[in-house]
């Protein structure tokens, strides 16, 4: 059936009847720090009536029976079935929190842990932080004596294992949204399997909207016989609340999905009935571009006398909360909402009224290239699971339609699921955590999806260069153990621990805290030039790190005033969080007796301290007009958001991360002196024979691969 779209032509496979019924599933986010808001269709009922309306309620006793009789229960439950909020409460009601025991529930994202904890506390009539609490990075809202249901990120669960390796206070651990397969989800999965062998009483629930249940069952099942009666793991499926969704594909590919998204929205508005539109794109820049184009289209349609108007709204993680909330505001019957979103709308929010979904077919993910040692954000095709999840957004409240901006043949060639983070990430933080947990032979660790060997070697080399590992790949004392205690990238941890030696711990604390917060600068589409002009007041020629320091110090000087932030187009909540993060990091520096010192306005000690942690992320300006990495001569460019963009390019820079769009762009960039690299990382860099050249000297890093096996020696020196 041809879809009502002009230049973009769709067709729906199959019959003229209802399309594919899509059940939503949750997918890992690249931009996931936004506010979670969940639409509740039963809000008018009492709390108890709402609980009983959820599909999982009918299976309450069966779930408790399975948990009593199996070490591991894999629960596949569609979005909205109630598994995240209800199962922990069923466990508490059945006695699993008696005698001081705790039910722990992990979430892959901080915002989900906080939101679900708040909902469960509300349902139980409890004060959040007492019986029900949450623990996320830099924010522990629990009571050691009173908390019985604890929501936490998977990363925080792994950190708890550093103090209590067998998780002795927990009776049940529930891994929610396990299919997202984040780095720390996979670490937790491997560690929990080891713990279960020591603790037969520990119960594990692996829950998700959609996952490869058989793979999880095979991984956790400790039955070594052919007798199914001796299985230790079982699968349970819970139904949900979804409506049929008709799927439409393109008849032929289009070269520009941004333009096609705009055309599709306009045609739906002109030819389809009531219902709001949700369009998926890959990032903030694309979202803002499409929003601007659609606003122009809406004005043009209004001039033609069209009675129904379009209200176009952006939705992405870095959008201020008050802007995000606009997508939930009711509109009159003469207005149709169009929400243009990143994949934050796949999982972190649920919006009522969506009937039409437009899927561009791409997503922005973090990927690590072990050959270049660069981790960056890249735009890649979505998985089939993610595409189905997007389509399901149109079937929440009634039957819907999904327009995919790609062919059915292209859909069939998409991967079934997204590659786990473990296989596409920088593994230095992972290895550091495993080493701190006593896992000496990380290459023999039971990963559910083993990471590439080259990525492991690259991570070991970096940790060795930072001084966190010795030549035998053991954690160094005290530096390695201290780096492992920081809930940060090892480079940030090293920078913080060295800050006292450089006499600038006060400044480095502020910089490190600010670098943990995304989108500090707010640029409203209708005030772009004004916002950029105001932001330039904070900029310094040294680069982004000191610019962020200026922003933070100005925020503190103005008593953390929200009005001041609004006037200066700054993310108030982000800055408040940066202040909280700074206090947490400060406690660690006090613990490790790092001297409290300030550089008193001198930038050099601060810059040198940054280099002491980020020396591996160095690049030099090339005659071609681009930058080249010192390590592998990879071409990089300064990101347009950097204060150094469009300025006279510094000869040498260091950066925090790289993102890939049309080019590889460095973000959070600061100018440095090449001599600092030789001075602060002589083990990593050596002076070349020609002027202004450096060698990358890789130390001898030995990796024990097998118990009785061999040693792989890395001893390379590359002249650039």
Curated annotation (Swiss-Prot):
Function as written in the Swiss-Prot or TrEMBL entry: May be involved in pre-mRNA splicing.
Family according to the record: Belongs to the DEAD box helicase family. DEAH subfamily.
Catalytic activity reported: ATP + H2O = ADP + phosphate + H(+)
Assembly with partners or alone: Identified in the spliceosome C complex.
Domain Helicase C-terminal: start-end pairs: 261-438
Keyword field: ATP-binding, Helicase, Hydrolase, mRNA processing, mRNA splicing, Nucleotide-binding, Spliceosome
Gene behind this protein: DHX35
EC numbers for this chain: 3.6.4.13
Protein name: Probable ATP-dependent RNA helicase DHX35
Domain Helicase ATP-binding as annotated: residue spans: 64-229
Family annotation (CDD domains): DEXHc_DHX35, SF2_C_RHA
Motif (DEAH box): 176-179
Protein origin, superkingdom: Eukaryota
Keyword Hydrolase: yes
Residues given in the record as ATP binding sites: 77-84
Pfam family, one: OB_NTP_bind
């Amino acid at each position: 059936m041809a879809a009502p779209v002009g230049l973009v032509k769709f067709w729906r496979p199959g019959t003229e009847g209802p399309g594919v019924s899509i059940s939503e599933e949750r997918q890992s986010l690249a931009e996931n720090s936004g506010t979670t808001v969940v639409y509740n269709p039963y809000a008018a009922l009492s709390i108890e009536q709402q609980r009983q309306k959820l599909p999982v309620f009918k299976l309450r006793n069966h779930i408790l029976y399975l948990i009593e009789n199996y070490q591991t229960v894999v629960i596949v439950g569609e979005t909205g079935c109630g598994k995240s909020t209800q199962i922990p409460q069923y466990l508490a009601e059945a006695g699993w929190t008696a005698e001081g025991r705790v039910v722990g529930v992990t979430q892959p994202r901080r915002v989900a842990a906080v939101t679900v904890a708040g909902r469960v506390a509300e349902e139980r009539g409890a004060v959040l932080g007492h019986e029900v609490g949450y623990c996320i990075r830099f924010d522990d809202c629990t009571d050691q004596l009173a908390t019985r249901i604890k929501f936490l990120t998977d990363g925080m669960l792994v950190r708890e294992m550093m103090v209590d390796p067998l998780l002795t206070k927990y009776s049940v651990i529930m891994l929610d949204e396990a299919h997202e397969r984040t780095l720390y989800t996979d670490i937790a999965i491997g560690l929990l399997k080891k713990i279960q062998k020591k603790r037969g009483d520990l119960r594990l629930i692996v829950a998700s909207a959609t996952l490869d249940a058989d793979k999880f069952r095979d991984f956790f099942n400790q039955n070594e016989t052919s007798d199914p009666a001796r299985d230790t793991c079982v699968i349970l499926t819970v139904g949900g609340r979804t409506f049929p969704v008709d799927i439409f594909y393109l008849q032929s590919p289009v070269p520009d999905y941004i333009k096609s998204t705009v055309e599709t929205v306009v045609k739906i508005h002109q030819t389809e009935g009531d219902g709001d539109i949700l369009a998926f794109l890959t990032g903030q820049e694309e979202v803002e571009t499409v929003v601007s184009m659609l606003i122009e289209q809406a004005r043009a349609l209004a001039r033609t006398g069209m009675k129904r108007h379009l209200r176009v709204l952006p939705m992405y993680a870095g959008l201020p909360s008050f802007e995000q909330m606009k997508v939930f505001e009711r509109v009159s019957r003469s207005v149709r909402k169009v929400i243009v979103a990143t994949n934050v709308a796949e999982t972190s929010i649920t919006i009522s009224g969506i009937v039409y979904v437009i899927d561009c077919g791409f997503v922005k993910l973090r990927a690590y290239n072990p050959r270049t040692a660069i981790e960056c954000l890249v735009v890649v095709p979505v998985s089939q699971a993610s595409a189905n999840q997007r389509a399901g957004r149109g079937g929440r409240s009634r039957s819907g339609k999904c327009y995919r901006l790609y062919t059915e043949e292209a859909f069939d060639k998409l991967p079934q699921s997204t590659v786990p983070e473990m296989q596409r990430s920088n593994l230095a933080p992972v290895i550091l955590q495993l080493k701190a947990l006593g896992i000496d032979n990380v290459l023999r660790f039971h990963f559910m999806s083993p990471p590439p060997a080259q990525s492991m070697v690259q991570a070991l080399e970096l940790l060795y260069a930072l001084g966190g590992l010795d030549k035998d790949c053991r954690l160094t004392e005290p530096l390695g153990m201290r780096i492992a205690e920081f809930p940060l990238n090892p480079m940030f941890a090293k920078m913080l621990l060295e800050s006292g030696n450089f006499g600038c711990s006060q400044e480095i604390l502020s910089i490190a805290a600010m670098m943990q917060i995304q989108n500090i600068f707010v640029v409203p589409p209708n005030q772009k030039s004004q916002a950029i002009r105001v932001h330039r007041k904070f900029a310094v020629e040294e680069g982004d790190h000191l610019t962020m320091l200026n922003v933070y110090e100005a925020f503190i000087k103005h008593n953390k005033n929200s009005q001041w932030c609004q006037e200066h187009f700054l993310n108030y909540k982000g800055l408040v969080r940066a202040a909280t993060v700074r206090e947490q990091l400060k406690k660690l520096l006090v613990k490790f007796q790092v001297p409290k010192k300030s550089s008193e306005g001198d930038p050099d000690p601060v810059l040198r301290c940054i280099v002491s942690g980020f020396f591996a992320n160095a690049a030099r300006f090339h005659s071609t007009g681009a930058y080249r990495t010192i390590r592998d001569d990879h071409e990089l460019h300064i990101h347009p958001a950097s204060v150094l963009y469009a300025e006279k390019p510094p000869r040498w820079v260091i950066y925090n991360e790289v993102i890939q769009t049309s080019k590889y762009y460095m973000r959070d960039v600061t100018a440095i002196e090449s001599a600092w690299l030789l001075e602060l990382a002589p083990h990593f860099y050596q002076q070349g024979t020609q002027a202004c050249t450096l060698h990358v000297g890789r130390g001898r890093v030995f990796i024990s691969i097998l118990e009785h096996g061999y040693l792989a020696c890395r001893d390379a020196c590359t002249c650039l």
